[in-house]
A protein has these predicted regions:
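Low-complexity, Pro/Ser/Thr- and charge-rich linker/hinge segments at domain boundaries
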Residues: 8-10, 139-162
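Ligand-binding face of N-terminal immunoglobulin V-set domains in extracellular IgSF glycoproteins
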Residues: 95-125
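Contiguous beta-strand segments within globular domains
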Residues: 13-61, 157-171
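Short acidic/polar inter-strand loop motif in beta-rich domains
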Residues: 64-66, 110-111, 124-132, 192-193
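Aromatic sugar-binding surface patches on proteins
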Residues: 84-87, 92-106, 205-219
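Short, aromatic- and glycine-rich surface loops/edge beta-strands on solvent-exposed regions
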Residues: 57-59, 116-122, 218-219
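Extended low-complexity, serine/threonine- and proline-enriched intrinsically disordered segments
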Residues: 51-79, 177-200
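Bacterial Sec-dependent N-terminal signal peptides
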Residues: 1-6
């Protein structure tokens, strides 16, 4: 995998439909879980055709910008690459034949050792070099508290078409020596990564609180 390629949740095959990546048990949710927690990521998709297809997956650990990290699999996961997806159900009485597949992570075969961004690359076991889709999610460690607010009062207008996003990081239990360089901040609009705001610098740095307020990039 090219280390400079940024991973996105993306489908590369016309045989794959209705891909969903979410927290298991939730109808709609942002795809992130806590490291070592009880929750699981659910990857759900339909594969067109009659009968079971042996789909397998590899786990890729990513940097903050979703490029592949330099960690080796043994450093970020317990288990083996190339595990098959065996939880499936064939369609019954439908015009188009398909099978629904579900993958839960972590599971008995794969567990995460470290937090970070992850990309699951799924392929037909017969053609391992052809990735049919990629599913992205995050595994987090809640070592700081983040409080955020949205205001209609901005430097552009007041209570009209713009809003100001502000947030504070309470790092009382997690010392950060140089927040200007040690922190990588990404602000997404409705989980969109195409217009993410990055490279933010704090407005103020106190002993236990780092504030990002009145930033024009967050309007």
């Amino acid at each position: 995998v090219n280390a400079q390629v940024k991973f996105f949740t993306d489908v590369n095959s016309k045989q794959i439909k209705t891909l969903q990546v979410k927290v298991a048990g939730e109808l709609i949710s942002e795809p992130y879980i806590a490291l070592g927690g009880e929750e699981q990521i659910e990857i759900n998709f339909d594969g067109l055709g009659s009968g079971y297809t042996r789909y397998a997956y590899n786990v890729v650990h990513c940097n903050a910008d979703w490029t592949q990290s330099q960690l080796s699999p043994i450093e970020y996961m317990n288990g083996f690459q190339g595990t098959t997806i065996d939880d499936f159900a064939n369609s019954i009485g439908t015009t188009t034949q398909y099978s629904n597949y579900r993958l839960l992570l972590p599971n008995d075969d794969v567990q995460f050792k470290v937090s970070g961004n992850y990309a699951i690359q799924v392929y037909n076991e017969d053609t391992p070099d052809q990735i049919i889709f990629t599913a992205c999610f995050s595994v987090v460690e809640p070592v700081v508290n983040i409080s955020a607010s949205v205001s209609g009062n901005t430097d552009i207008d007041t209570n009209q078409s713009h809003q100001q996003v502000s947030f504070n990081i309470n790092n009382k239990n997690f010392p950060i020596t140089y927040p200007q360089t040690d922190l990588k901040i990404f602000v997404y609009q409705d989980n969109r990564r195409d217009n993410a705001v990055t490279d933010l610098q704090p407005m103020s740095i106190l002993e236990n609180q780092i504030s990002y307020t009145y930033n024009l990039s967050l309007i």
